[in-house]
Amino acid sequence: MSIRGKTVLITLAITLIGTAPVWSQSLVKTLDTDNDGTVDLAEAKSAASKLFDKLDRDHDGTLDKRELRGRVNAKDFATADPDNDGTLDKNEFLALVEKRFKAADPDNDGTIDAKELKSAAGRSLAPLLK
């Protein structure tokens, strides 16, 4: 690889590393309705409930894979759909949010901060909140 190519890759990597905290801090700030610097489960579920309503374009009270637009992979969708009807109702969707929230809260303090949101578990939760 040329020196120019390496320079471009290094610059890109630095940019991505530098922006990771910004998006997670921004999301926490958006969801943190009590302004304590963290997101608790109630705040996460409130945001997820609003997103559910926004994604439910046909207003049938469920989300199918098309409406979820890649926010949930096939394996997680199947697990979150215990009645196997091919859709998630709001309770099933919020149960998935709670499961991902708990996975993103390794210290079990009931809140997620920007650092926890940047973890793999936090990154899987984020698309269900915004």
Language-model region placement:
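Short beta-strand elements of solenoid repeat domains
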Residues: T30, D53-K54, T79, K102-A103, ...
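Carboxylate-dense, calcium-coordinating segments in secreted/extracellular and ER-lumen proteins
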Residues: T33, T38-K45, T62-R69, D89-L94, ...
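Acidic carboxylate motifs that coordinate Ca2+ or other divalent cations, activating on Asp/Glu
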Residues: D32-D36, D56-D60, D81-D85, D105-D109, ...
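Bacterial N-terminal signal peptides that target proteins for export
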Residues: M1-I10
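Bacterial N-terminal signal peptides
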Residues: I10-T19
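Short, low-complexity, Pro/Ser/Thr/Gly-rich segments in the mature regions of secreted, periplasmic
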Residues: A120-K130
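Mid-chain, structured segments of secreted extracytoplasmic proteins
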Residues: D60-A103
